[in-house]
Amino acid sequence: DSFCMVKDDGAGIYTSTGSSNTVYYNRKIIGNIILNGVAAKFGVDVINSYLPAVGIYLDENATYVDVLNNTVANCAKTGMNVHNSRFFTVLNNTCYIKRGISDNRSCNKK
């Protein structure tokens, strides 16, 4: 409960391989409840509309990740975000959020 309170541009669950092309298999994010990604907007020299706190974030070359049956609520940015990732499965996730869903359409918006 509650994350990205001091630093932002993060997630409740975050995975990344970075700039390498190393492939990891059998990675699973299943059955989690992720709440209150608040984003550290005070004391940062950016516009207040930039609130990078995501529920689940597959970033930079994350490969072979199954994201199944998770619930995400009250995140400042989106319930789920996928950036430059490959060979992933996202099914049956529910997002209760204020600002919408990233364009992967992998959550059932409530």
Where is each model-derived feature located?
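Extracellular beta-strand/beta-solenoid scaffold signature
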Residues: K7-N21, V44-D59, N74-T78, S102-K110
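Right-handed parallel beta-helix
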Residues: D1-M5, T22-A40, Y57, T63-N74, ...
